[in-house]
Amino acid sequence: MKLRPLHDRIIVKRLEGEEKTAGGLFIPDTAKEKPQKGEVIAVGNGKKNDEGKCAPLDVKVGDSILFGKYAGTEVKVDGDEFLMMREDDVLAVIEK
């Protein structure tokens, strides 16, 4: 991928949602909700603070994250779909 986000933006690849319910029923693609978790693919160089210095981001490439339902902007690059969002849209980092 040849995308480099600017400032405090990050690029996220959604993690696939559940294919079936807890009861064992398969969920068709049209009924699935888009997952609200993903993997960070790329990060910007940081956000400028009050002193004009660039503060590094808390999230790193490879982090699994949770984000809000309406967070980010969907972009398509080379046939792959990604979300571009600000670090402020990230709700939590999933610890492994």
UniProtKB/Swiss-Prot annotation:
What are the GO cellular component annotations? cytoplasm
Q: Which CDD domains match?
A: cpn10
**Which processes are annotated in GO (biological process)?**
chaperone cofactor-dependent protein refolding
User: Where does the signal sequence lie?
Assistant: none
Q: According to its UniProt record, what is one Pfam family this protein matches?
A: Cpn10
Location of the protein in the cell? Cytoplasm
Ranges in coiled-coil conformation: none
Annotated NCBIfam families: PRK00364.1-2, PRK00364.1-5, PRK00364.1-6, PRK00364.2-2, PRK00364.2-4, PRK00364.2-5
- Report the family membership: Belongs to the GroES chaperonin family.
Q: How does it assemble?
A: Heptamer of 7 subunits arranged in a ring. Interacts with the chaperonin GroEL.
Free-text function comment from the UniProt entry: Together with the chaperonin GroEL, plays an essential role in assisting protein folding. The GroEL-GroES system forms a nano-cage that allows encapsulation of the non-native substrate proteins and provides a physical environment optimized to promote and accelerate protein folding. GroES binds to the apical surface of the GroEL ring, thereby capping the opening of the GroEL channel.
**Protein known as:** Co-chaperonin GroES
Q: Which gene encodes it?
A: groES
